[in-house]
Amino acid sequence: MLATAKMSGVAFAEGVPTPAPVQTPTAADDPAASKFSKLRGVNLGAWLVLEKWMTSDTFGGTEAEDEYTLCQVLGNKAKDRLDEHRDTFITARDFRWIKSSGLNAVRLPVGYWALEAPAPYVECSRYIDFALDQCQKNNLKLVLDLHGAPGSQNGWDHSGRAGAINWPKDPQNIEETLRVLESFAQKYGNHPALCGIELLNEPRQEVPLDILQKFYQDGYTRVRKYLAPDVAVVIHDSFRPLEWKNFMQQPAFNNVILDTHLYQCFDHEAKTRSGLQQLAFALNRRTALDEMKTEELPPMVGEWSLSLPHKAMSGLSSLQMESVTRGYAGAQLLNYEATRGWFFWSYKLEQPSEWHFRHCVERGWLPSDFSV
């Protein structure tokens, strides 16, 4: 999902812009992209890839900070601990609620250990099956997102193992990632609910661009042969949103979506802005989204939340804080509706917060019906 020092990598003007009319992409823009014409969804974060800050109870009784270490510490008890979490954190009731809210999609983060788990990980393939089947039952689409790669593509806990960024340093790590992606495509490529496979979540800027671009091209080749034309291949911008012009163009590459993650709470420059300035910043993101958009690589916003730096709320009354939060939600939705789709991070956490989609809806910060 995120780390405490992430930035969008794009500078935005401070002035309050006049938003351009939103033109929703449709299947007519690209007939092969019909499953990805307008997705409104949530991430099922911390379910099949653990994040301690979201589900600390799962880490109870240990000092582990990531899934790798937790499984290592628990040893032969790891499967029972993780299965209990996986069985209860997301259930059929959650998919029904997601559908009832008017959303039409979920983004499902999984690790490279999902199908075949090297020690100490615990595989979770039956939960992917469950998620896809629940999506089909509730007329939802699913983006399968490879959130953690061998060696770690970003060094953050949500890659499975926090620490060094070793993924790009060993060709075997990259080849294993490609093998896993091909296995995903073989197993799930024909599922009616699948609308996209994301090749890699949030590869950090330290990953050399040439290595990452070759990986994306190779990954496309490995999965596309198993996917219907209307199932997208999704690539993340690596927090370098303007580096993808003229990349993976048609006709060699078809139905590719560029994922960007937009968080103001981790932008160092944004931490000094007032609440009003935060709203102006959010409104101005449309400019950045337009700048990164190309005909070949239309964008989606794969992660966003309502969390803002503490400075934004400093000195505000409760009513003002509520107004800023609602305004921030509206500003983001206004702009993200102009993309192929968006996914809030995350559907739920153990504790209510600006990251907890259901809580945000119940508080009135977000709409209660997204089907309008």
Which residue ranges define each predicted feature?
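Aromatic- and acidic-residue-enriched segments that line the glycan-binding/catalytic groove
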Residues: 52-65, 120-123, 151-169, 253, ...
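N-terminal export signals
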Residues: 1-15
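N-terminal carbohydrate-binding accessory modules
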Residues: 15-103
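Extracellular glycoside hydrolase catalytic/binding regions
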Residues: 179, 186-189, 193-196, 200-333
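Aromatic-rich peripheral "rim/lid" segments of glycoside hydrolase catalytic domains that contact
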Residues: 318-372
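Hydrophobic faces of well-ordered beta-strands that scaffold small-molecule active sites
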Residues: 38-44, 106-108, 142-146, 195-197, ...
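A short acidic, glycine-rich active-site loop
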Residues: 76-88, 164-174, 277-287, 323
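An active-site-proximal structural segment forming one wall of the substrate-binding cleft
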Residues: 84-106, 116, 120-148, 158-196, ...
